[in-house]
Amino acid sequence: MSNPSFNRVAIVNRGEPAMRFIIAAREYEQEHGERLHTIALYTDPDRRAMFVREADEAYSLGPATYLAEGGQHKSSYLDYERLEQALIATSAEAVWPGWGFVAEHAAFADLCERLGIVFIGPTGDMMRKLGDKITSKQIAEKAEVPVAPWSGGEVATLENARLHAERLGYPLMIKAPAGGGGRGIRRVRNESELEDAFESARSEAEKAFGNRAVFL
């Protein structure tokens, strides 16, 4: 990175990710002679944490969790309303999300764009496209990037799954295009396993991601 169009960077993360950026900002200043003003956004339990002390500025998000819709307690680093207030209050010009929390939230990248704040990462539109494994594989193919043989799109019926499996050969994988963490994925070693794997992958994907779509 050289000649950034921003100076005040809010860190929407904590612990090691936050410290890594603070250190990188100092190294950038030494190398380029341009200062990046780091702003640590922290919650109450972290008020004495190293990343809070080492940042140029710190802003409290309050309690570590908030009550989200549905009555669930979630991290305050996921509370868009609170984050928006913090970004405005600190006059942040850019946001570094690190990893986890809002780092892969397209809606948060959109929020930053609406506020005129640079999101250091991909755009919300790009996240949405690459977050879907079917769309991302199609984009890769369009760019002539080699990809493993696959169904070429969603496989909606068992009949189509059998046709694609015959073309691809066994063993193969059935995978949901959304989410991750090993959910919605099944290994199929032979034709006798296909039906159960296809139905269970779709069922698990719907429960985990609200979408029954799968591909081979």
Regions inferred by a protein language model and the residue ranges of each:
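N-terminal beta-alpha lobe that positions the nucleotide/phosphoryl donor
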Residues: 1-216
